[in-house]
């Protein structure tokens, strides 16, 4: 009985840790959004950022991505759009107004920790994944 109780306590502790980690990832995604995206998309991701009047094409309302995609959040497409490296050959924007964040993140990798210097793509993927997870939570039903 004591072994079962210990096992249950350990399992519960692991679950709480995972919830805390997931929450911190969402908060990091939110911080990433506010520092990188809100200037165009707005703090609430509705496309009303302070730079909107100066852009040729208005930024989309990112809270409506799932609704515009038949009710399913298009995570892969969002990640590819944020990354941008597959679609752009030259410069930080290429032919689009949105920055190529994959390139920006790759160039900045290693500034925070040694692991990122060894594997900058990990940092790029983590940042884009956190940002995508945050956007998924903002979706209007």
At which residue positions do the language-model features occur?
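Bacterial N-terminal signal peptides that target proteins for export
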Residues: 1-11
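N-terminal signal peptide c-region/cleavage motif recognized by signal peptidases
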Residues: 17-19
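Periplasmic/extracellular electron-transfer cofactor-ligation site
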Residues: 24-25, 30-57, 68-72, 83-97, ...
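Extracytoplasmic/secreted proteins, especially bacterial periplasmic and envelope-associated proteins
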Residues: 28, 32, 61, 73, ...
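Axial heme c-ligation environment in periplasmic c-type cytochrome domains
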Residues: 53, 59-60, 84-124
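A charged, solvent-exposed segment within the mature domains of Sec-exported extracytoplasmic proteins
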Residues: 121, 130-141
């Amino acid at each position: 009985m004591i072994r079962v109780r210990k096992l249950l306590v350990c399992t519960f502790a692991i679950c709480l840790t995972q919830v805390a980690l997931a929450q911190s990832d969402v908060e990091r995604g939110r911080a990433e959004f506010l520092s990188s995206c809100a200037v165009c998309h707005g703090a609430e991701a509705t496309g009303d950022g302070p730079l909107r009047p100066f852009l040729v094409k208005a930024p989309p309302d990112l809270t409506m991505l799932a609704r515009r995609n038949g009710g399913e959040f298009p995570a892969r497409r969002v990640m590819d759009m944020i990354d941008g490296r597959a679609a752009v050959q030259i410069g930080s924007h290429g032919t689009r107004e949105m920055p190529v964040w994959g390139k920006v993140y790759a160039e900045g990798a290693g500034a925070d920790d040694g692991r990122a210097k060894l594997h900058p793509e990990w940092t790029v993927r983590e940042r884009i994944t956190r940002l995508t997870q945050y956007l998924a939570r903002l979706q209007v039903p």
